[in-house]
Amino acid sequence: VKKKRIILPTDFSNNAWNAIAYALTIFKDVPCDFFILNSYQVGASGLSTKMAGANDTRLYNLIKEQSDRDLKRELEKIKSFDKNPEHTFIARSIPDNLVNAIGKTVYREEIDYVIMGTKGASGLKEVFMGSNTYKVIKEVDFCPVIAVPDDYQIEKEIDAILLATGYEHLFENYELKPLLNFVEHFKAKLWIAHVGSLDALAPEQKASKKGLKNRLKSIDYEFIEVEKDTSVNNTIQQLVEKDKTIDMVVMINQNHTFFERLTREPVIKKVSFNSKVPFLVIHLFE
């Protein structure tokens, strides 16, 4: 069995730790290589003098040492939390912005998932990790990302997963794989929610739904039709609120999904900020 390779970004905040603990818990029986990644940037001071250059270098070295030190501490914490001998942990301290640091690592290390919190050290959701998580979802569009809400505690296995879709394209095996990994591993129920008007589906939507049926032969799934509430995001949140068994929401991100055309609503962005349960975004290679 090929080990799963997973990036866990951290800014050493409680929220970052919460996402790490979540990842270690859901993959507790799966052999994994975890890349614990901290990125940092030293802003140029704008003075093009030798002194400024020397200051930047000094600052850079200080920040780098701090990052290495904090990562070492984080690894010790992880190893006391996670005793699985089939889990390997690799610390990466990278002098770059978060999106680049993650993107390059995904590419070089053939990463399967990026799992990160939705709130960073600042505590304001839209600041740091908040907007960063969305940036990672948007820019690192060649790797599935799981955004873990800041106060989310996993209490049990994953019972049910909600895939929200507009049946806007024919599903390919590669895009369903990151979702089916969880469904199969946890023997979870898969709810496939079509959110929109309850009018009859267009022919291409029917084809998409039929294709999905063929791909899901061996698993426990059910289709549901949901009338769109004020927004797709609200509708999804209400479904999760109502059905307490849903432990993960999944969406496939196309450049402009059916949802976004239909509603002019940046659904993925909204759900990534508002979801009460972990949110898996899978990208479509167009």
Regions found by a protein language model. Give the residues of each.
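Small/aliphatic-rich secondary-structure junction motif
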Residues: V1-T57, A160-V226, I246, N274
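A short acidic, glycine-rich active-site loop
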Residues: N55-R69
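Conserved N-terminal glycine/acidic-rich loop preference
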Residues: S67, I111-V114, I154-G166
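N-terminal, Lys/Arg-enriched amphipathic/low-complexity engagement segments
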Residues: K72-E76
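A short helix-to-beta-strand connector/capping loop
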Residues: S80-I90, K217-I224
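Charged docking surfaces used in two-component/phosphorelay signaling
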Residues: I90-A101, S231-N233
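Gly/Ser-rich helix-loop-strand patches that form or flank binding pockets
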Residues: G103-Y152, V240-E286
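A short, acidic, amphipathic alpha-helical segment used as a generic capping/interface helix at domain edges
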Residues: D229-K242
